Amino acid sequence: SSANPQITRKRHKINSFVGLM
């Protein structure tokens, strides 16, 4: 269940990058 939060963090970073574009 440690991979779940890790994926969310990665997704959040990608979302932030897309929002900046």
Curated annotation (Swiss-Prot):
The protein's matches in InterPro entries, at most eight in alphabetical order, are given as: Tachy_Neuro_lke_CS
Methionine amide PTM sites in chain numbering: M21
What GO CC annotations are associated with the protein?
A: extracellular region; synapse
Please state where this protein is localized: Secreted
Secreted as UniProt keyword: yes
Locate the region Disordered: 1-21
Q: Which GO terms describe its biological process?
A: chemical synaptic transmission; neuropeptide signaling pathway; regulation of heart rate; regulation of smooth muscle contraction
Arranged from A to Z, the UniProt key words for this protein are: Amidation, Neuropeptide, Neurotransmitter, Secreted
Primary role:
Tachykinins are active peptides which excite neurons, evoke behavioral responses, and contract (directly or indirectly) many smooth muscles. Is a potent vasoconstrictor and secretagogue that plays a regulatory role in the central control of ventilation, in particular, the heart rate variability (HRV).
Family the UniProt entry places it in: Belongs to the tachykinin family.
Question: What name has this protein been given in UniProt?
Answer: Neuropeptide gamma
Query: Organism source for this protein?
Result: Oncorhynchus mykiss (Rainbow trout)
The organism's taxonomy opens as: Eukaryota, Metazoa, Chordata, Craniata, Vertebrata
